[in-house]
Regions:
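Beta-strand-rich domains and repeat architectures in extracellular enzymes and scaffolds
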Residues: 30-98, 135-136
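Conserved beta-strand positions in repeat-built beta-propeller and related beta-rich domains
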Residues: 82-92, 147-150, 154, 204-213, ...
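Beta-rich, blade/repeat-based domains predominating
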Residues: 61-81, 125-145, 182-207, 236-272, ...
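Beta-propeller blade signature
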Residues: 97-107, 160-172, 220-225, 399-415
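Blade-level signature of beta-propeller repeat domains, shared across WD40, Kelch, NHL, RCC1
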Residues: 369-444
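Beta-propeller fold detector
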Residues: 109-122, 174-180, 228-243, 293-311, ...
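Blade-loop segments of beta-propeller domains
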Residues: 67, 102-154, 174-183
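Short loop/turn segments immediately following beta-strands, especially the blade-tip
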Residues: 103-108, 169, 222-228, 285-300, ...
Length: 444
């Protein structure tokens, strides 16, 4: 009976996902983000039940222990269709897969199974030629999956931190870069890669990486296979904002720079990197033309300190992941409000007065840890969000009887319609300007 039920659930999941990704729209105005997948606990596509039991016996898999952090998707033209990738860092024991994709297989109690990416051989704990612990990923417009592997299992640095690149068409490794030990601190944890791919063939590619507990920014130059470390006071946690209250569960966490994203290209060719610390209500920014300058930082990680600027106005609460769309609209979680916020960087100054709450739900929007703006094949932009019951992990109250992890999605045009983030409806001839510290970006 259980096998038959699981088979039916798998068929239903496949049909539902097909309908969803064909049209990620929601007809209910009070439920703008549509559920794609949800889990009470993560389960994996072990080769067979004996392999699963063996993994449990030796502690490689502790049911209920794995926790997803990030999500990204890629729509293949070939036999794979759309793949939805998830990352599962090994910051605690019992995580058999650190990078995988969601399959149509479903357990008897409704949890979609996750398959290892690219395969099981890459998931061996302690194998430094494989994947050790992946926090976040990014798929660029040239079909490359960028994977930031911290090399840490729990608090132990078992392998060098490395940045890997896989081809989405062949699922093969096309590049691996191990960061020099001189750029890694004992406390370092590289958690967020932001890919800046320029040129028709993406030959000019840089990756900006947040060191959340080393309070630094790493810059990787893919063409020249080199990296450098940048230090700035704005990368640190803000002590007054180190206490988090999510659905009346309170915990402390002094994490630094974590949420990052890039603006669209400006008319003069530059882009802006927006960033914030997790323990913070402050958003900051820096022109990428500054941080891409290797000679500027090669001998002085603290160079150009005044080029990093914090907005004078703040959010109402802390935020984790964020992403910006092609119109310059920033999307981010508002942790204590259990909401997704947006800010129109083209027409408004930064600050809570101009931040819209475009989705809010105390059950489904707890701690948005992964946010991506995805451009579909027809050019339509979609917002994809991974939410987790992170506060339950921090307070030890995680329950296997409740839904703890969710992937949700929506069409951006529908999310922002009628709000300050609806750029298309705003008078493009407005003379109003949005001022970013010492930089002024006129309304386009």
């Amino acid at each position: 009976m259980a096998i038959k039920k699981a088979s039916i659930l798998a068929q239903f999941a496949a049909i539902f996902l097909t309908l969803l990704v064909a049209d990620v729209r929601c007809n209910d105005p009070n439920d703008k983000l549509r559920a794609v997948y949800s889990w009470k606990a993560l389960e994996f596509t072990f080769p067979n039940e004996q392999a699963r039991e063996a993994a449990i016996a030796v502690g490689d898999f502790i049911p209920g222990s794995p926790m997803p952090i990030d999500v990204d998707t890629y729509l293949h033209d070939g036999r794979f269709g759309r793949r939805i990738f998830v990352t599962i860092p090994r910051f605690q024991k019992g995580v058999p897969v650190t990078l995988g994709f969601v399959t149509t297989e479903v357990t008897a109690d409704g949890n979609p199974k996750i398959a290892p990416y690219p395969n099981w051989n890459w998931q061996r704990s302690g194998d430094c030629d494989g994947l050790t612990s992946v926090w976040r990923i990014e798929i660029d417009r040239c079909g490359r999956l960028w994977v930031m592997d911290t090399g840490k299992i729990e608090e132990r640095q078992v392998c060098p931190a490395q940045l890997l690149v896989f081809s989405m068409e062949t699922n093969r490794l096309i590049s691996r870069y191990r960061f020099p030990q001189s750029q890694v601190r004992e406390s370092s944890l590289f958690v967020t890669p932001i890919v800046d791919a320029r040129g028709h063939m993406c030959h000019d590619t840089f990756v900006y990486i947040a060191d959340v507990s080393g309070f630094s920014l790493l810059v990787y130059d893919h063409q020249n296979l080199r990296s450098w470390r940048i230090s700035n006071n704005l990368f640190y946690p803000y002590p007054n904002y180190g206490t988090f209250d999510i659905k009346n569960e309170v915990f402390d966490l002094m994490d630094g720079i974590l949420g990052m994203t890039l603006s669209p290209s400006r008319p003069y060719g530059d882009r802006i990197l927006y960033f914030h610390s997790l323990a913070s209500k402050v958003e900051s920014y820096v022109p990428t033309s500054v941080i891409r300058n290797y000679t500027l930082f090669a001998d002085n990680p603290e160079a150009a300190s005044r080029s990093f600027v914090a907005f004078k106005n703040e959010r109402s609460t802390q935020s984790a992941a964020q992403a910006m769309d092609k119109n310059g609209v920033l999307f981010f979680g508002l942790l204590s409000e259990l909401a997704i916020g947006c800010w129109n960087s083209v027409n408004y100054d930064y600050g809570d007065e101009f931040i819209e709450r475009i989705a809010q739900n105390e059950d489904t929007l707890q701690f948005p840890s992964g946010i991506k703006v995805i451009t579909s094949k027809n050019g339509r932009q979609e917002l994809w969000v991974m939410t987790i019951s992170f506060q339950r992990v921090m307070t030890g109250t995680m329950s296997p009887n409740e839904t703890n992890f969710r992937i949700q999605a929506a069409v951006i045009d529908e999310l922002v319609r009628g709000t300050k983030c609806d750029v298309a409806s705003i008078n493009i001839n407005s003379v109003r300007q949005s001022t970013h510290g010492s930089l002024t970006f006129p309304t386009e």
